[in-house]
Swiss-Prot record:
Gene name of the record: mtnA
Gene Ontology MF: a single term: S-methyl-5-thioribose-1-phosphate isomerase activity
Function statement: Catalyzes the interconversion of methylthioribose-1-phosphate (MTR-1-P) into methylthioribulose-1-phosphate (MTRu-1-P).
Active site (UniProt): 237 (proton donor)
Reactions performed catalytically: 5-(methylsulfanyl)-alpha-D-ribose 1-phosphate = 5-(methylsulfanyl)-D-ribulose 1-phosphate
Any one of the GO BP annotations: L-methionine salvage from methylthioadenosine
Organism (species): Syntrophotalea carbinolica (strain DSM 2380 / NBRC 103641 / GraBd1)
Name of one Pfam family that matches: IF-2B
Documented EC number(s): 5.3.1.23
Domain of life: Bacteria
Lineage, opening ranks: Bacteria, Pseudomonadati, Thermodesulfobacteriota, Desulfuromonadia, Desulfuromonadales
Binding residue positions for substrate: 46-48, 89, 196, 247-248
Protein name: Methylthioribose-1-phosphate isomerase
């Protein structure tokens, strides 16, 4: 059974600290929005859908603590809360989607007493979390039809239960295929520099009893050439209107390799990851993270001091390299501009 990385209980938001996995399973408690923002920024929680769920809970915690004498002042304070949460990570559009949904819910309830609005916002955050799990399962059912029995599936980064409200996007498709009776084995790229593949994907799949083999990022091409991979499936942090996909750094390289070797390259993502306001991948903001993630592994330095370092957290895979985009409302192929727009 897949883990849920975010919980709400008795006024407290709890998150598993994904930075410590797989060696330590530590749950942290959050009682205010500033702490939730820090958790998103420092990657206690990560993965676009999970970030959206965490942000919704953060907005609800922030709303709970607002002292206001009018709806207008409450809404202004809620916007400040949401602005703080929105400033944490720029690429994952689910973050902004969830925060806008929370503010829209507040505006919808303008006629109610403020205490009732605050309670409704916590209910809305819980609804976002529950709906994300249901969305992932629907996506899994659609995507499972694309995965053949006995398939050897390569995935990059972690698009599993840990990256969502539960079940997973790319790993949700794999889980659904296994649940349908198919024999599936997974190859997980380690995913430098944050090692989400080795620390998180391998941990999740192993915990669920799904066969998984960990590989270094630079092994993928050789294994494709040797016929050891049948298809690739990844998640997404933002999908532009034309089907270009921003995902964890290294995804583009895997897509190029898949194209060269004639392998299907699938992207699994909910509608909340699709940003029709962004025309193409060139307009997606790409987060640059601290260089220490590249120069260090934990406390151990791996590179000389003073060296120049780049650490973009994401890259963009052009739509032309993508075989299909799997969503909770079905699978889109070919004309992504029309196909993605028709989902809404």
């Amino acid at each position: 059974m897949s883990i849920k990385p975010i919980e709400y209980r008795d006024g407290v938001v709890r998150m598993i600290d994904q930075r410590l996995l797989p060696t330590q399973e530590l749950w942290l408690e959050y009682r205010d929005y500033q702490a939730v923002a820090e958790a998103i920024l420092t990657m206690v929680v990560r993965g676009a859908p999970a970030i959206g769920v965490a942000a919704a809970y953060g907005a609800a915690l922030g709303a709970r603590d607002i002292e206001a004498d009018s709806f207008e002042s409450f809404l202004a304070a809620l916007k400040n809360v949401c602005d703080t949460l929105a400033a944490t990570r720029p690429t994952a559009v689910n973050l902004f989607w969830a925060l806008e949904r929370m503010q829209a819910k507040a505006r919808e309830l303008a006629a109610l007493p403020l205490d009732a609005i605050k309670a409704a916002l916590m209910d809305e955050a819980q609804a976002i979390a529950a709906q994300d799990d249901a969305i992932n399962r629907a996506m899994g059912r659609h995507g499972a039809e694309l995965i053949a029995d006995n398939a050897r599936v390569l995935t990059h980064c972690n698009a599993g239960a840990l990256a969502t409200g539960g079940y997973g996007t790319a790993l949700g498709v794999i889980r659904a295929a296994v649940e349908s009776g198919k024999k599936i084995s997974v190859l997980a790229d380690e995913t430098r520099p944050f090692l989400q593949g080795s620390r998180l994907t391998a941990w999740e799949l192993h915990k669920d009893g799904i066969p998984v083999t960990l590989i270094c990022d630079n092994m993928a091409g050789a294994l494709m050439r040797q016929g050891e991979i049948d298809c690739v499936i990844v998640g997404a942090d933002r999908i532009a209107a034309n089907g270009d996909v921003a995902n964890k750094i290294g995804t583009y390289s895997v897509a190029v390799l898949a194209k060269e070797h004639g392998l299907p390259f699938y992207v699994a993502a909910p509608l909340s990851t699709i940003d029709l306001k962004i025309p193409d991948g060139d307009h997606i903001p790409i987060e640059e993270r601290d260089t220490s993630e590249v120069t260090h592994c934990g406390p151990t330095r791996l590179a000389p001091e003073g060296i120049n370092v780049r650490n973009p957290a994401f890259d963009v895979t052009p739509a032309g390299l993508i075989t299909a985009i799997i969503t909770e409302r079905g699978v889109v192929r070919g004309d992504y501009v029309r196909g993605l727009a028709n989902l809404f």
